[in-house]
Amino acid sequence: MPTLILVRHGQSQWNLENRFTGWWDVDLTEKGVEEAKAAGTLLKEKGVLPTVAFTSFQTRAIKTLHLALEEADRLWIPETKDWRLNERHYGGLTGLDKQEMRDKHGDEQVHIWRRSFDVPPPDMEPGHQYDPGADPRYDGIDVPTTESLKLTIERVLPYWESEILPVLASGETVIISAHGNSLRALVKHLSGISDEDITGLEIPTGQPIIYQFDDRMQPGERYYLKDS
């Protein structure tokens, strides 16, 4: 039975500091490292052992994958990195303190920027100190200046359909180590969650989420591996 494992990266430094992160490359905290290791230990204990891995271009997701795979004795499996699994781009909010933004713009406006389905934050201006456009990992990529969840879905789902789903359909156990919003995009699709309801879905850091697929590649109900 094809099995999909979704893992949001462990706590990052900007998660800890309550800052908008998006495409900026931020490392894991010590807690984030431990969360990633614990995810791998759980995979091993439950016997849910990945055979193929996918992750983003961002360090926090890549490290989470490697730390988890090491704990599960699966560092040797093939892995693919792709920018389309990156976090949602938070535009001009990148690097800013979330509470300071609430104080400045009000809770409602910040909630709309963070959680609405199709309203993106303000664009990132050229020369912004956290502009990832000059990063060599994005050579040849048309880096967005901002993204809503809807726009994030529009890059994640074609990648899922063309690159990940065929691997899963061949019978592999696939692990995807990614980000809160790129994983929300997948969960919305796989679980048939409405545009309205997806805004309330939280993906916790370092907690493996499992989908099992039937012979017609229809996913069952998602569940947290720790609860199985």
Swiss-Prot record:
It comes from the Bacteria. Substrate binds at residues 8-15, 21-22, 60, 87-90, 98, 114-115, 180-181. GO terms for biological process: gluconeogenesis; glycolytic process. It catalyses: (2R)-2-phosphoglycerate = (2R)-3-phosphoglycerate. It is an enzyme of class 5 (isomerase). InterPro entries: His_Pase_superF_clade-1, His_PPase_superfam, PG/BPGM_mutase_AS, Phosphogly_mut1. Keywords: Gluconeogenesis, Glycolysis, Isomerase. Its EC number is 5.4.2.11. GO terms for molecular function: phosphoglycerate mutase activity. The record marks H179 as: Transition state stabilizer. The active site is at H9, E87. Belongs to the phosphoglycerate mutase family. BPG-dependent PGAM subfamily. This is 2,3-bisphosphoglycerate-dependent phosphoglycerate mutase.
